[in-house]
Amino acid sequence: MKRVLITGANSFVGVNVEKWLLQTPDEFIVETVDTMNEAWKKADFAKYDVVFHVAGIAHVDPKPKMAPLYYKVNRDLTIEIAKWAKKHGVKQFIFMSSKIVYHASKSLKGDVITENTKPHPNDFYGDSKLQAENGLRKLESSSFKVALLRPCMIYGLGNKGNLPRLAWLATKTPIFPAWHNKRSMIHVYNLAELVRQVILRELSGIFLSLIHI
């Protein structure tokens, strides 16, 4: 039996991972906590085996004035929660990062991202995620495993990201140029199963999809 705490109580990924894990109640006890106003510090981290950290700012706002907030939430809060988890005996910390740590594609040229691709973020959203990853790696030890998830575009019922916008646009303007544009996606339930396997197998390291964007 694994006891899991999910940060980001109402997030798209958090809600769906919780539902997925609870389909096997003999394997998991799952609880959630909000990260607003340090509410997470009231949770008893000592009773959990795993923290799945989903809370963060997920979409890019290009305004430079937003950069400090991204670093505060995506980097500083992540590392603070991980330190708290380690201090209280949590054995595994799973961080919801993003393929954006490689770069935000701004051209029609296709780039293939593999496990050998080196991160090179070109905006503060990606950089805040990468800096969080680097901070988490410094905390890793034999008794505190760190798993970093770098998924591609996530879709599924209830998603408010880019794909629903594109689908809506297609219904209004069903004419697309002759571009051979490819982009990998992952259904939220497939992502949830990845999280499930990472927990059950007590894995650490970096996990991503092979991406053609």
Predicted regions and their residues:
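Conserved Rossmann-fold NAD(P)-dependent oxidoreductase catalytic core, especially the SDR/UDP-sugar
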Residues: I79-F124, A147
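Short alpha-helix in the Rossmann-fold core of NAD(P)-dependent oxidoreductases
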Residues: Y71-T78, I94, S128-K129, S184
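A conserved pocket-lining segment of Rossmann-fold NAD(P)-dependent short-chain dehydrogenase/reductase
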Residues: P62-K63, W168-I186, Q197-V198, E202, ...
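N-terminal Rossmann NAD(P)H-binding glycine-rich loop of SDR-like oxidoreductase domains
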Residues: V4-W20
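Glycine/proline-rich active-site loop of Rossmann-fold NAD(P)-dependent oxidoreductases
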Residues: L130, F144, Y155-R165, Q197-L208
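Catalytic helix-loop patch of NAD(P)-dependent Rossmann-fold dehydrogenases
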Residues: K72, S107-I154, I175-A178
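Glycine-rich "substrate-gating" loop/helix at the edge of Rossmann-like oxidoreductase active sites
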Residues: C152-N159, A178-Y189
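NAD(P)H-binding glycine-rich loop region in Rossmannoid oxidoreductase-like domains
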Residues: W40-D76, E80, W84-K87, V101-A104
